[in-house]
Amino acid sequence: MNADRLLRWPVILALLPALMLLSGCKENRGDPSVYNRHCASCHGREGQGLKALYPALTDSAYLGDRIGELPCLISSGVRGKIVTGKRTKNIRMPAFADLSIQQMNSLISYLQLNWGKGGETVSEQKISQWLRNCP
C-alpha cells in the first residue's frame, strides 16, 4: 500500500505544470465586470445595442478586421458618425481613458470571446502599441 502512494507522487508532480498552465489560460478569457461596469448600460448585457441609439457589438467590424481601432475608440470615445455592421450611426460614446492596460485587455478579450469574429484575445503589448498609434 505504501508503494502505491509512492508511485502516485511522480504522476501528480508530472501533471502539476500542465494544470498550472490550464489555470493560467482562464485568466485571459476576459472579465465581464469591466464590460458590465462601463459598457452594458448602452450596448446591452448581450451586446445587442439599443435600437438606433447605441450600436450592437454582435456584428461589429471593430471585433474583426478593425480590432486595432477599438482601443482608441474605447480610450478616446466617439463623437459623430461611426460605421457599425451595415449602418452608419451618429453617436456619442464617452471616453474611458482611465482604464488601465490590464482592464482594457480584459474588456477587449471579453468582447472578442463573446462577439468577435475570430474569438481570439489580444495581448497587452498589442493594445499598448495600438494606443500609441491613436490619431
List where the protein language model places each region.
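Bacterial N-terminal signal peptides that target proteins for export
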Residues: N2-A14
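C-terminal motif of bacterial Sec signal peptides marking the signal peptidase cleavage site
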Residues: L21-G24
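N-terminal hydrophobic targeting signals that begin at the initiator methionine
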Residues: M1-N2, K26
